């Protein structure tokens, strides 16, 4: 009986630890970052226009597309920053005062894609994530929200946005990452933060 309980405990602990092992498999950022860096002049221009760190833009390009402007995902996310026309693309169009959504050819255009990606990061920062005080925590919140939606992130803290932001402001960057790893419904959420750090270190 004791042996059976011990075996169960080992399995339970293994399950808990594997849930948070978002660094496996390891991700080598060197080549994706090198390819993403070729777009740095555009990233700097878009970053200046929208108040977004061009290194953050470059890291997202490395993670999302590996620097390939023609990349198209199974979910129809398109281009360097893997934007979806019907969601993030439509949000950017609305911010610009335009109707409709971007075309596939527009999203495959490096300058337009990076500009819209930077605009979307600005929408997240000044909208649902407004009020986050720690710059590193904000950076982590931005990439998790960029990949999986701001609502999914905030709901792991509270259904009330203001309360969620207040709880986020009680955490430092490491505590925020741990919270995401333990509570976010998308397994790729903490892994995105891991990849972000790998990409920034490779620049």
UniProtKB/Swiss-Prot annotation:
A lipid is attached at residue 16 (N-palmitoyl cysteine). Keywords: Cell outer membrane, Cell wall biogenesis/degradation, Lipoprotein, Lyase, Membrane, Palmitate, Signal. It comes from the Bacteria. InterPro entries: EmtA, Lysozyme-like_dom_sf, Transglyc_AS, Transglycosylase_SLT_dom_1. Its EC number is 4.2.2.n2. It is a lipid-anchor. PROSITE patterns: PROKAR_LIPOPROTEIN, TRANSGLYCOSYLASE. It is found in: Cell outer membrane. GO terms for cellular component: cell outer membrane. Pfam families: SLT. It catalyses: Endolytic cleavage of the (1->4)-beta-glycosidic linkage between N-acetylmuramic acid (MurNAc) and N-acetylglucosamine (GlcNAc) residues in peptidoglycan with concomitant formation of a 1,6-anhydrobond in the MurNAc residue. GO terms for molecular function: lytic endotransglycosylase activity. Residues 1-15 form the signal peptide. GO terms for biological process: cell wall macromolecule catabolic process; cell wall organization; peptidoglycan metabolic process. A lipid is attached at residue 16 (S-diacylglycerol cysteine). Belongs to the transglycosylase Slt family. HAMAP family: EmtA (MF_01381). Murein-degrading enzyme. May play a role in recycling of muropeptides during cell elongation and/or cell division. Preferentially cleaves at a distance of more than two disaccharide units from the ends of the glycan chain. This is Endo-type membrane-bound lytic murein transglycosylase A. It comes from Escherichia coli (strain 55989 / EAEC). The lineage of its organism: Bacteria, Pseudomonadati, Pseudomonadota, Gammaproteobacteria, Enterobacterales.
């Amino acid at each position: 009986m004791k042996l059976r309980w011990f075996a169960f405990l080992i399995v339970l602990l293994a399950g808990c630890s594997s849930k948070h092992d978002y660094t496996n498999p390891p991700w080598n950022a060197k080549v994706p970052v090198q390819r993403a860096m070729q777009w740095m002049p555009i990233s700097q221009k878009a970053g200046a226009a929208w108040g977004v760190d061009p290194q953050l833009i470059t890291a997202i390009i490395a993670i999302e597309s590996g620097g390939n402007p023609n990349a198209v995902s199974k979910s129809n996310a398109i281009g360097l920053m893997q934007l979806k026309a019907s969601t993030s693309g439509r949000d950017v169009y609305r911010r610009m005062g335009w109707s409709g959504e971007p075309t596939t050819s527009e999203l495959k255009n490096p300058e337009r894609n990076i500009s819209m990606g930077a605009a979307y990061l600005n929408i997240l920062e000044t909208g649902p994530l407004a009020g986050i005080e720690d710059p590193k925590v904000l950076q982590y919140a931005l990439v998790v929200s960029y990949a999986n939606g701001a609502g999914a992130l905030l709901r792991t803290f509270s259904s009330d946005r203001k309360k969620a932001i207040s709880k986020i402001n009680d955490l430092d960057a490491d505590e925020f990452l741990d919270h995401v790893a333990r509570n976010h419904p998308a397994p790729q959420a903490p892994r995105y933060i891991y990849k972000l750090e790998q990409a920034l270190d490779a620049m």
